[in-house]
Amino acid sequence: MKKIVILSFLFLFAKLSFAESGWQLGATVPIGASFSFYNVYFSKDAPQSYKDNYRKNSGTVGFDAGITFQAGYLVTDEEKGISLLVDIGYSHDSFGLKSSYKDETTQQDINVREYYTFENMQIGILPKFHYNNFAFGLGIGVKVPLYLTHSAEFFNDNTSTKTFSYYDVGKIDDVMKNIVMTYIKLTFDYSFNIQDNVALLVGAYIGTDFGIDLRGAEKVLVESRNLASLDIGAQVGMKFGTTIGN
């Protein structure tokens, strides 16, 4: 299947390479929601109190935003085309988690809501398929965390306690075993050509961030502690260079 997709892409690119072509530059601002998924597996030596602290019942909604810059080349036959873009920028990604446990001392139920908020540099590629003013993209790349904020709020009856922890690029490995996360995204946008070689983009995206191993220093009692998300949102942007459509 993978070979068929690659061959189809190369065939279409070769077919269009004899048509009009040109460079494209652009910038995009995505804003959306993040739905988190969390899995943890403990070693056989982990005590129950330790498991209660690190086990999470479910994910909750986080917030994503950022700005990315694209540069690449478009080949087109005026109605349809293919572009291959480098996609570089900044992303703000938050992962929300919920859990609950019983305090061994007071025997009271404790509810916990926590967020891992990453400030990332991202780099990847974004091939796009164009038809008139519409474009569909499939992006893949990595995000490198530059700063991490971990916040947690503990609810007990009518009281709550908040904690915050901050990790710069030199200390993120206290929390993460790996130093990068992987992303995949599907994009859709519509171009409003406002003048020659300038277009306004309005669209949407759906994607996932994964490969986040939160073991950090907890490598003895935890065998794996993985965080991922499903991201959905809207995006606006501008592009400059060769365009398709009206």
Residue locations for each model-derived region?
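Flexible, solvent-exposed coil segments and beta strand-coil junctions
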Residues: 41-53, 101-109, 158-171, 216-217
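Short glycine/proline- and aromatic-enriched beta-strand/turn motifs that initiate or cap beta-hairpins
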Residues: 19-80, 231, 237-246
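Sec-dependent N-terminal signal peptides
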Residues: 4-14
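Predominantly the C-terminal beta-signal and adjacent terminal strand-loop region
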Residues: 38-47, 51-55, 91, 176-246
